[in-house]
Amino acid sequence: MALRVLGVTQNLRTYMRGVEIIKRYKSALTVKKTLLNIPATQVTQLDNGLRVASEDSGASTATVGLWIDAGSRSENDRNNGVAHFLEHMAFKGTDKRSQTDLELEVENMGAHLNAYTSREQTVFYAKCLSKDVPKAVEILADIIQNSQLGESEIARERSVILREMQEVESNLQEVVFD
């Protein structure tokens, strides 16, 4: 009886190894298929020097943004924090749009507007329907070129940024990787 149980156990192990190999093979095929289906990135340069990277995924949605090579690494003692500060101020309104108008326009498009600052870059981007890309580009251009920097908004954002800095400084992982 013990030999019979041992034989069944060995057969079960052999079967399970086979199942595991098939799972790995299928997983590898899925990864390979996914990598092969990533759309090619087309990089072009406009007459004004602006580089444009685009991909056609065939989806009805798009992400469009500005990746500016000016992050915290580009700062010095005199202008420390300016990239992060300007990122925060970008959505406070422009010469053409108040903050409320900007928010309503983006919301009515069903879009999402956001920004972030890293060591290398400051990024402003919009997620929207593909048909709304021209409007999203126009809004982003307006924000980058015509942001208003009102005294009350500056004071309010200053306290927000100082609070964010305290949160980062209290997170040991953030401090170590900084």
Predicted segments, located by residue:
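His/Glu-rich zincin catalytic helix
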Residues: 2-101, 125-128, 138
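Acidic/histidine-enriched segments that form metal/cofactor-coordinating
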Residues: 17-25, 29, 94-95, 99-178
